Amino acid sequence: DFKPSNLRKRMKKAKKATDKARKILKRFDNLDILVCHQPPYGFLDKVSGEYGAPKHWRGKHAGSKVILKYIKEKQPEYVFCGHIHEEKGKAKIGKTEVYNLGMCGWKIVGI
């Protein structure tokens, strides 16, 4: 359950995860396939109440700006992500095909 008192702790944890993602992605210059937990910000990342998200998150984007920046700069062929279960599907960022697998558990994609 979401409790406002946990927000500061959760934001600190999220900042650490963002910093870690930034450091990891800097090590990889030209990936063909990126598999990550969060979708890129603004793509397949909108939260609904379908899976019990708190009201203040509903309708908002919850993807990663770090991942979006990497995709725009490096243009890997494919990105596979999850995290935002209700936004499963496919999107395109430049030449990159982005797949949010949602909660499907598996997906067959011809490469």
Where are the regions a protein language model picked out?
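Residue-level signal for functionally critical sites in structured catalytic/ligand-binding pockets
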Residues: 1, 44, 63, 81, ...
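Binuclear metal-dependent phosphoesterase catalytic core
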Residues: 65-78, 85-111
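Active-site-proximal loop/helix segment associated with metal-binding centers of metalloenzymes
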Residues: 1-60
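Short secondary-structure boundary segments
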Residues: 38, 82-84
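Short, hydrophobic beta-strand segments that form beta-sheet elements in well-ordered domains
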Residues: 34, 78-81
